[in-house]
């Protein structure tokens, strides 16, 4: 009858025999060390007694005292050293020897083990290098945490929480930026120039002067607590956006543009008549009464809006350019614009 001997079983037996031999050898060394330490302590005590008797028989009193003090200190050093060695109950595990003895077995077990994922639960492998950062192993393999291990764990938890908080904050800011990008205005150059022209009340008013005029309207609305305040601010924001768009497109000194200069720039940008605005024909505007914001009226031409602004609206309406989405921030108070 043949018996099959598995390589791993013989290997484990050899390791077991070797560990048993090492333990016996360690016990013998420990016993010898204990005997040696006890003998050393006895010799120290005997030397102390001998020195004391010699010093008592010495005629020179000063030299006797000096020798007695030195002998006493020497004896105390021996006793204290012995006590320290006796107090050291924890014999640390030799990590290097542990790795050397167990590396082959660990490799074999890992190579022949099943997947580390069982029933959807990840099994984290034992990492002795990571463990000794937070504690020590005694001779029997028991793990003992150091005093600062808890502090390190708390610090790791705090860092993890900070990462979570920072991630949530980044996601929130990204969403806000995405909304801002979606809501930001995008115009072709000729569209931006056409809108800019409506903010200039006459041929001589510059863009900078228009901003000053709108700011005065804002202050008046604040002082009167008028409903128009929000829509005057919308006008200031739209004008600022138009300036930024044109500057990014390469236009310089936009703040110095007046109606005449804006119109010249429009003519340079228009490629065909379909992009040209005809005041009496092109329907561009819708409006709402401030006291009836749920009712929309439009679309109307520049000519119609200009006439009603002078004779009918009485600064009680808000207006919106036809291409703008119907959102609150796109409605502007009529006093901000000049249609012709």
From Swiss-Prot:
Residues 14-30, 62-82 have a biased composition (Basic and acidic residues). It comes from the Eukaryota. Pfam families: GYF. InterPro entries: CD2BP2/Lin1 (IPR039905), GYF (IPR003169), GYF-like_dom_sf (IPR035445). GO terms for biological process: mRNA splicing, via spliceosome. Residues 47-59 have a biased composition (Acidic residues). Residues 282-340 form the GYF domain. The keyword Nucleus applies. GO terms for cellular component: chromatin; nucleus; spliceosomal complex; U5 snRNP. Residues 1-86 are annotated as: Disordered. SUPFAM superfamilies: GYF domain. SMART domains: GYF. Belongs to the LIN1 family. Interacts with the cohesin subunit IRR1. Interacts with PRP8, HEX3, NFI1, WSS1, RFC1 and YJL149W. PANTHER family: CD2 ANTIGEN CYTOPLASMIC TAIL-BINDING PROTEIN 2, PROTEIN LIN1. This is Protein LIN1.
């Amino acid at each position: 009858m043949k018996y099959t001997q598995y390589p791993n079983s013989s290997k484990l037996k050899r390791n077991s025999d070797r560990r048993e031999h090492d333990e016996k050898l360690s016990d013998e060394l420990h016993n010898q060390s204990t005997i040696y330490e006890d003998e050393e302590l006895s010799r120290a005590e005997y030397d102390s007694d001998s020195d004391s008797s010699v010093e008592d028989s010495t005629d020179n009193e000063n030299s006797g005292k000096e020798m007695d003090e030195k002998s006493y200190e020497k004896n105390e050093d021996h006793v204290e050293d012995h006590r320290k060695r006796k107090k050291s109950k924890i014999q640390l595990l030799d990590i290097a020897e542990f790795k050397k003895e167990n590396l082959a077995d660990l490799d074999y077990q890992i190579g022949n083990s099943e997947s580390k994922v069982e029933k959807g639960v990840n099994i984290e492998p034992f990492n002795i290098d990571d463990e000794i950062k937070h504690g020590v192993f005694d001779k029997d393999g028991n793990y003992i945490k150091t005093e600062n291990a808890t502090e390190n764990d708390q610090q790791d938890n705090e860092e993890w929480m900070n990462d979570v908080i920072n991630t949530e904050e980044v996601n929130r800011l990204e969403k806000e930026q995405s909304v801002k990008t979606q809501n930001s205005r995008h115009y072709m150059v000729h569209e931006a120039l056409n809108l800019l022209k409506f903010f200039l009340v006459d041929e001589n008013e510059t863009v900078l002067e228009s901003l000053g005029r709108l700011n005065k309207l804002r202050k008046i609305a604040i002082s009167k607590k008028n409903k128009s305040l929000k829509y005057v601010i919308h006008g200031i924001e739209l004008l600022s956006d138009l300036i930024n768009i044109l500057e990014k497109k390469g236009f310089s000194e936009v703040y110095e543009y007046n109606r005449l200069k804006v119109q010249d720039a429009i003519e340079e940008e228009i490629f065909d008549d379909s992009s040209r605005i005809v005041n009496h024909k092109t329907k561009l505007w819708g409006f709402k009464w401030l006291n009836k914001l749920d009712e929309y009226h439009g679309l109307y031409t520049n000519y119609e809006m200009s006439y009603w602004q002078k004779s009918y609206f009485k600064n009680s309406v808000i207006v919106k350019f036809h291409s703008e989405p119907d959102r609150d921030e796109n409605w502007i108070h009529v006093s901000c614009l000049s249609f012709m």
